[in-house]
Each structure stands twice: as structure tokens, then as C-alpha cells.
Curated annotation (Swiss-Prot):
Domain Helicase ATP-binding: 164-334
PANTHER family the UniProt entry points to: DNA ANNEALING HELICASE AND ENDONUCLEASE ZRANB3 FAMILY MEMBER, SWI_SNF-RELATED MATRIX-ASSOCIATED ACTIN-DEPENDENT REGULATOR OF CHROMATIN SUBFAMILY A-LIKE PROTEIN 1
Assembly and binders: Interacts with the RNAP. Has a higher affinity for the core RNAP than for the holoenzyme. Its ATPase activity is stimulated by binding to RNAP.
Organism: Vibrio atlanticus (strain LGP32) (Vibrio splendidus (strain Mel32))
Coiled coil residues, start to end: none
Motif position, DEAH box: 280-283
Protein name: RNA polymerase-associated protein RapA
Amino acid sequence: MTFALGQRWISDTESDLGLGTVVAMDARTVTVMFAASEENRVYARTDAPVTRVAFNVGDVIECQEGWSLSVEEVIEDKGLLTYLGTREDTQETEVTLREIFLSNQIRFNKPQDKLYAGQIDRMDNFVLRYRALSNQYQQHKSPMRGLCGMRAGLIPHQLYIAHEVGRRHAPRVLLADEVGLGKTIEAGMIIHQQVLSGRAERILIVVPETLQHQWLVEMMRRFNLHFSIFDEERCIESFAESDNPFDTQQYVLCSLDFLRKSRKRYEQALEGEWDLLVVDEAHHLEWSQDKPSREYQVVEGLAENTSGVLLLTATPEQLGRESHFARLRLLDPDRFYDYEAFVEEEDQYAPVADAVTALFSGVKLENSAKNQITELLSEQDVEPLFRVIEGDSSEEEQALARQELIDNLMDRHGTGRVLFRNTRAAIKGFPKRNVNLLPMDIPTQYTTSMRVSGMIGGKMAPEARAMKMLYPEEIFQEFEGEDSSWWQFDSRVNWLIEKIQDKRSEKILVIASRASTALQLEQALREREGVRATVFHEGMSILERDKAAAYFAQEEGGAQVLICSEIGSEGRNFQFANQLVMFDLPFNPDLLEQRIGRLDRIGQLRDIDIHVPYLKGTSQAILARWFDEGLNAFAETCPTGRTVYDKYSDVLIEMLASGNTEQLDEVIEESAKLNQSLKSDLEKGRDRLLEMHSNGGDKAHEIAEKIASTDGDTNLVTFALSLFDTIGLNQDDKGENALVVTPSEHMMVPSYPGLPYEGATITFDRETALSREDMNFISWEHPMIQGGIDLLLSEGVGASAVSLLKNKALPVGTILLELVYLVDAQAPKRSGISQFLPKTPIRLMMDGRGNDLSAQVEFDSFNRQLSPVNRHLASKLVNSVQGEIHKLIEAGETHVLPKVEEVRQQAQKDMQTNLNGELERLQALKAVNPNIRDEELEVIEAQINELTGYISKAQVQLDSLRLIVVSHN
């Protein structure tokens, strides 16, 4: 390296220092001053990590005074360069600029500048960058975007609803699936799609207080969406940042009670400018024409101010038509304006459902059914289809004609677009429940303490006393103190220990009402028999619960028993277990259903054993009999349970409080009758049409298969591991399909997006991720991959590289130049541009004569023939052919333009086909189905105009390049 005072050099290792000037030299060292960053560096002369900055004819360079010069000649004198050329601002010719006056801020952002300045990256980084661009492009174009990356089983009806609703602009729908069919997951998938496509940036979820935790966990665990729970305390804290606390976070979760109680907070939430509002347990919003409840008004206000609304409810409309209408009214007040009109319209659907049932079953259509169909659809539409169905066409044609009729009827179906409801009856794949009710003798210690408690109990409200009598172990502790070892003599504990020993190879889930009972049971199992058990209760943090759940899920060396309290178990699913023990019973049927729902979910592969040990002659015995004989709530799901409970709760509470069972048989008999009649009403009113529409039929299975085929993508695994390597993360293989990824000291950036400070355990396998909640499920949509790709591209990793091609068929020294361009339409994310024209890479492979060989030379197979070059040699190679590289880049510019035009035209065509198709369908439907909102049509028209503008203005720029030189050795 020859240095001279006044020369300009750039640091290879600290490119952000700017342009440096040689200010001092001695025999062994050289001092370079970087004026832009006010830093000096002293290097050894022999191998200083710096590169000489020399510009060529054709470059545009900037002077310290701010003007630019287009270089026409370069003169070297005693190691210093002087540039001659034309000033860009005044057009003055033959202006000279000595290199000492070059701007200190010059950064080499363009890939060719980096190449000339010797900032040459490793070859594998260039490959990684190209793969990042290609994969990012494919992900954006995929119609399944937003559905592949969530940690959930691929269940067809859920995927269908999410796919159907998630792609709409500002969806307003009611998700009314029965318990255990996964409404929360459906809502999460819709939110996830809306977030990824940029349609929803601000989201508010309103849920009952007891479910806040569950939603927080589900959104974070399954979809990597980090919500913040807002309560009064949080709002006061946020006041420092903003007048409206709701503006401090994009994703907010709060309880309905919190908004109902505080008018101020409710008004602030109204001003929050949300894109999407999600309300869980919407059946609690009571409404009547003259007197809507305060809760209902709160949600109504929010729904009026928010463009997208998802309401979730488990209560079927047959159990309350008025409240069902009220929920639909929240979604579209213009359409559902009058309850009487709604009832009348609903009654007209009964014949539609009959007609569809007839079509589905494939029986010959009666004339009456045909007339009904003709009344609903116009005659010229249906006549040819009837002819096909009744003629002697092939079975396939008949099936298609039936399907077309069904689709047309579906589209006309009043609430088809706003309401989705799946029932267990319509969806296969649920386990059978084996129920074991186990009456046990009551220990004398309990009888004594309960008797004494009854005598000194004084005036307690019946409800409080009923609650108390359900838990004899707590009454005993009141007299004997907290430390009393009730579990030494409780017959249920003795039975439980035997059961655990009997089922050594099975995982057992035990649920008790109170956290204290759960903790004491764990102690009992540990101290009496050394059983490996773990506890789960509301006093634990999310992380502690995760660890407990993971310990329970572990195949080898994990806990055999997990003991949960009532609240602690909310929202957690343990499908891998099939033994459920109810140590005591909850007060109402909803909670009972929730307990069984921890195991009895879609995706459970085995039948479930439900064990209910209870003490004879106690309140528990009364409750066990009523649940079993009155509701049959242990053996099957009980959507009617709540209604029956509301009717008989007073009598039940009285019985539980006093222990008097005279009326029990009568109450059980009446409950069973009422339950039966409600269930048959439900069955009669089952809206087959709605069910068919909600479960998506074959289409749903296609979506599930499509996503399943992308699981286990080896391309993703290879890419992720190279990405983590390049950015500098440590990776340790942990077995069981898992890796541990931790930050290292040599990272490219101080913190890696999506990775906690202490690292994370990751898996690429969906099944593993489902059984182990402590692992991150890595997919193309995971923040660690998305964030990593963004980091790669923004930090300029792999923008320029040099490789050798050992090929005796070509003369030594032949050069090839690989150019990767990026077509980018500068448009806001919410415009939906990424679906039609995401950032699109175009690869060219220029030979020495300026021809493009990319069509003949495929990237991967060519890349395997190349070998890397060290930086020093790479710089020399670049300097020796710099002039030729210039010419090839110019040739590349002309080759790429027609390709950019093709990309634009294809994007425009895709967009027109997609959006015009949707627009025409909605316009045709609007004529017959009042459920289509005008606003939806206007939005699509505006979107077409807006996108046409963005696509036509899409720009292209050179993103990265690689010089390839042929050698023979």
C-alpha cells in the first residue's frame, strides 16, 4: 500500500466513519482523519483495513461546498488525484476538483460504489440476500399469507372462515361457533391476516375481565401479536406520554367492565381511531328495543367508530332471537334496523334451508322445492340447472349443477356474509367422553367441622353459604388452620393417588376450583408418594405457567400430573392428555364445559376419561347429580346448560346451602325436561344452510392441504440457519426438533428483532410447537424471520461480492456480472400493494459482450460451481476490470427496462382480475342480498384507482451485484 498526504481512503471495517484523509505518516504507521465523524485512526502501513477511494470517468462526485461534478477526466500526480468535469448545478465545463476537497460525507450505498470502494461482502451473504428477496416476494404473493405461521393445528373450518373473512376490507362479522371449535383462534387468524396485509394497524380487543389473560397469551403464543392490557393503573401511567392513553399502544386489550365503569376512559377509547374492534363473549351484551344495557351501548359506540368489527359468541340464536338480532345490529345498523322486519325475513329462510338440504342429500327435487328455489333465484338462472339435475347428464355434471344452485342460494342467504356458525354436529373429529362418577365416604373430620360451621355460621347469604359448602376442606381449615393436613384423610386424595399409580404411563389433568387447593394437592402427591406433579394457578406469571405447561408436556422426565385452579386453566389446551379429574365441581355449567374443553377439543385424538370423585351427603353430591342427570353435562356439550341453570339456580342454591335434598329429584326431572325441549328446538332450528356455508366444505380442506404442504419447508430451515449465522446468533441443537438460539457478542446489531435477551428455543415443526408452548414456531411469517430479512436488506449485507468460476471451457480472465434489480412501488402498506406488486427481484447475468444469460443460467446450480475469494484479491480483481464493469452495468440498465414493464403489466392485470371480479360479484349480489354494504363497493373502486397509479409509477433500482471471474486452477 502506498500512502501520500491528502489521499482519501475509506475504512473497510467501520464504513460509517465516512471518507477519511491521510494526515500523517511515519515508517510504520499512517494516521487517517475522518472529518465527518470527527474521529482519527492510526493503522499499521503494511496491512491497514482501508481502501483507496478513486472515482472514474462517468461518476458524479460531491464537493465539500455541496455542488456535484460529473467526471470527464482523472489526473494523477504524486499519488494524488484531481478530477476534471462539468458542474451539475451551473453546467460550467472544465471544472477541477482536487480529491482533498471531496465531501467527507460520501457513503457508498450503491452496490457498484461498494464494489469499487473495496467494501466487498462474502459470497454466501450475496446468496443469502438474493434468497431473502425471492422468498419475501413469494410470501407476499401467496394467497395463504397470514394463515401459515400461526401455532395452531390446521383445522379446515377455522382456516376457511379466517381465509374468507381475513381478506375482506374492514370485515364486520359474527363468529358464533359452539364451544371447543376455536373461535379465539379464528379471530386471531383474521387479526393476523389484517395486520400482515396492512389493513389493520390499530386493534382493540374487549373481553370479560376473566378472559383478559387468556387472550393475551393466545395472541402472543399463537400469532406473535403483543397486546397490552389496559386498566386504570396503566392509563394513569401512560398519561405522561399522551393525553389519550389509548394512543400509546397499537394493540390494546381491555375489559368491558373497565370501559363501562369509567365514562372518561370510554370516551378516550372512542377517540382511539381503531381499524379493528374484537368483542368476545358478545352474548353478555343485553339488549331490548326500549332498554339496551350500558355494556351494549359501550360496544355500540365503539362499533360505530371502527371500520372492522369481529363479535364472538357461543350462544346460538335459537336461545334468544332478540339478542341475536341485537348482535347483528352492531355489525350493520342500516341493514338490521327493525326487529320485526328481521323476524319476518328470518322466517322466509326456512324454505331456503329445506331446498338446500334436498339439494345436498341428492334426492329428487319435489315441485314445491323447485318453486321455492325459483322464487328466490330468477327463472332463467335456474331452469337450465334443473334440466341438468333431472336429465341424464353424468354424475359429475349433476353434482356441479347442484353445487351452483347451492352457491347461489348461499349468496342470497340473508346473514351468510356476516354470520359464521359451526356446530359439533356438523363437524367430525370430536372424541367420545367416558364419565366416571365416584361417590366416596365423607371423613368424620369433615362432618364435624361442617356441622359446627353450620351452627356458628350466623346469617350468611344463601349464595355465599352454598359456595362455602362445596369445599369441605376449606371449612376444615378454618378450624384447624391453613397448615392442617386435610389431605392425609380426604378419601378423594387417597383415590387420586391410586389412580395416578394405576395410570403411570398417562398424563393426568386435575382441576380444582381454588388455587390453594391445587397447591396443597401438589404437596400431598409429592409428600405422600413422590409423584412428579406441577401446578398452574392465577397467582403465576405467564412465563411460570409456560414452564409448568412445558414440564407437563415433556414426554420423558416430564410431570405426570398437572393440577390447575379454575381461573389458571383458562385458555390453555392439553390435547395430548386424555385423563381429566375434577377434584371438586364448579358452580355453573359454563365453567364445567370450560374444564372439559381443556381436553375435549377438536384435534384431540383419543377418547377422554372424565373422573368425578365426590363426597356422599355433601353439596358436591347434589351438584354432581344435577349436572349428570339433569343436564347430561359430563357426557356431552351442553349449549343449553346456562339457560336451564338460570331458571333453577335459586332452588339449587337453596339446596346447596342447606344440604336439604327433598326437592332434588323433582328439580332434576324438570331440568332434564327443559334441557331436552331446548335441545330439540336447537336441532329443529339448526340452520343447515349457515352450517354448510360456515364449514366451507371441500374448499376448507383444500386450504388446509395447501398449508400442510408448505409445512416442513427445508428451504426455510436452510435459510433461517444461514440468516442466524450471518447476523451472529449462537445456535445449539437441543434434539426433539428444537434449536436454542441466543445472542452473541459478535452480532451485527445490538439486539435481534423478535429475540429476547436470554435467547429462545425454536422449532420448525408444527406438531412439536403445538405440544410445547415454551418453543417458538418458526415460519416465514415469524417476527424473527421477517425482522432478520429486514435487517439484512437495510444493513446492505451481501450487496456486492466477487466469486471465481473454475471452468476450463472458458478462457482464463473471462468475466460475468450478476445483477439483481428490485422493482418497488412506493405505496402505503394498507393500500394492499403487496398482494399484487411486492418488492420484485429481477436477476440478470451479463457476459463480457453485454448479453443477458439469466434465462440459460439458473441461480442455484450456477452458484454451486463458484468458489469464494478473499477481500484483498477481490479488490485487485475489481480494480483491473473496473471499466468493463461500468459498461456492463450500463448494458444491464437497458436489458432490465422491458422486464420492469412486464412486471408492471402483470401486476396491473392481477389486480384488475382480482378486484374487478370481487366488485362484479358484490354488485350482482347487492341486487338480491341487502347484506352488501355500499361502503364495501366504494372501497374496492377507490382501491383499483389508487393501485393503478402506484403500479404505473413503480421504480427499479440495482440492489446487489456479483463479479464472477473465470480461473483454471
